[in-house]
Amino acid sequence: MAIKRTKAEKKIAYDKKLCSLLDEYTKVLIALADNVGSKQLQDIRRGLRGDSVVLMGKNTLIRRCIKVYAEKTGNHTFDPLMDLLVGNVGLIFTKGDLKEVREEVAKYKVGAPARVGLVAPVDVVVPPGNTGLDPSQTSFFQVLNIPTKINKGTVEIITPVELIKKGEKVGSSESALLAKLGIRPFSYGLQVTSVYEDGSVFSPEVLDLSEEDLIEKFATGVSMVASLSLAISYPTLAAVPHMFINGYKNVLAVAVETDYSYPHADKIKEYLKDPSKFAVAAPVAAGDSGASAAPKEEEKAAEPEEESDEEMGFSLFDD
């Protein structure tokens, strides 16, 4: 017969387990566990087995363990987790890809009926169509102001009806009607609310960003920095190339307007004095490209023509 452990022994064992997880893992998903059953949680643990560990427990106990761990080891990188322990939450320690782990957890959501008193996590809309209920049960629909008609001896809903809005409590009439229609409008599972990695905490929406999104946002940021730097004449890595170009343009403009000159400026001055020289340069370049195209046309002309059917000994009127 197994010896039953005392509360103190259970706390010591829990503290030891949490400290070992803090030593081993650097990535943690904080997940809300409202309305998640023990069987569902067991399935999630089984699905994540290998590179992830799900740890549930009282928030006060987890906070105390993290605080003691930081004092003993001097490692305070997990301190941000303490502020995230609000409500019925659990910790998912992982060595795998955070996005993949979140997607794996989402697979274990299960449908649930709308029980009386529950706060609706989503809007509940009853679709139009035949309900399969006999006319004697129209009172449920009348109480909720749902337009119906009798069609072939059964009640039919005419238009879509928003029965419950997100954030509202489920009433007895709504619960009874949804049960009769066989609608399970809610789904429950571990819902990732925050992500921790190497001392940083961020929203789970960040996991949906692709590499292309990051590159685009980075490029936008660089462009904004360059624009601001140019506007206030403050040199930054993003703005320096543009500053050099603008500076060169200014020097060139000064050289054109004064007697000061240098080789590149001489060429510009020459074009400004005699624009025809610039016009002559363009046809020369075009002529070079035309000359290169001529041999290709000759080669094409030299290709033998395909033999016709008659030349090959065939005729349309051959038997």
Swiss-Prot record:
The keyword Ribosomal protein applies. Keywords: Phosphoprotein, Ribonucleoprotein, Ribosomal protein. The keyword Repressor does not apply. Residues 304-319 have a biased composition (Acidic residues). Residues 286-319 are annotated as: Disordered. CDD domains: Ribosomal_P0_L10e. GO terms for cellular component: cytosolic large ribosomal subunit. Phosphorylated. One of its GO terms (molecular function) is large ribosomal subunit rRNA binding. One of its GO terms (biological process) is response to anoxia. InterPro entries: Ribosomal_protein_uL10, Ribosomal_uL10, Ribosomal_uL10-like_insert, Ribosomal_uL10-like_insert_sf, Ribosomal_uL10-like_sf, uL10_eukaryotes. Ribosomal protein P0 is the functional equivalent of E.coli protein L10. PANTHER family: 60S ACIDIC RIBOSOMAL PROTEIN P0 (PTHR45699), LARGE RIBOSOMAL SUBUNIT PROTEIN UL10 (PTHR45699:SF21). Belongs to the universal ribosomal protein uL10 family. P0 forms a pentameric complex by interaction with dimers of P1 and P2. This is Large ribosomal subunit protein uL10. The gene is RP-P0.
